[in-house]
Amino acid sequence: MFTIHETRPVRSYSGEKWFTNSSNKKRLAEDFKNKCGYCGDFDVYSGGYNVYHVEHFAPKEKFKELEFTYDNLLYSCPYCNLAKSNKWIGKTATESIVGDKGFVDPCTEEYDLHLGRDEEGSIIYKTSLGQYIYMELKLYLKRHKILYNLDKIRLKRNVLKEEIEKRKLKSQDFQDLEVIYNELGALFCNYYELIVEESPIYT
């Protein structure tokens, strides 16, 4: 079993408070490495930076004073952001969980206690609270597994490409690596076609 994020996102910005989503979004994208805080989807496969949202962990509709508080913000894909909307189980901004219902900040270690990935890349829940988050955020959508595997293939191809270039410079044989590189390219295209065939949002 794996964690949703290979590296847990950390909100590093602590400077001047910005009162626009656009200013906060730039810093969130850096802190979250351009991946959704909840599902880990890399924005490049879903329209890029402009398509992703600034998510308010404690909803701004209920806690207006936190609208531009950086520690309450996340970088989120539109699927997770729209699924969560202004859902909040507690009566205060700090009461995010009541019993086995509620949400966990993905920047905390606790998030990994409730949710993870199986060996095929699908998001899975580990606890009753994790199941609640899983269902509310629609983390069962196939796109999360597909995008996870797309990025794994991309990273493997990058490593192979570097090794191929090194062998070329040393006049060493590289055909074996080139075969694998091309096979991964075909696999990447197959996964990408699955995303194109995916149903529209919220189906």
Role assignments for model-derived ranges:
Residues S85-L160:
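Domain-level detector of nuclease and nuclease-like folds
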Residues M1-Y38, F63-E67, D71:
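Short, charged surface segments at domain edges that flank catalytic/cofactor-binding sites
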Residues Y132-T203:
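C-terminal, charged low-complexity interaction regions
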Residues D41-L73, K84-G99:
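Histidine-centered nuclease catalytic patch
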Residues G40, P78-N81:
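Cys/His-coordinated zinc-binding microdomains
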Residues K35, H53, S76:
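The −1 position to Zn-ligating cysteines in a subset of zinc-ribbon hairpins
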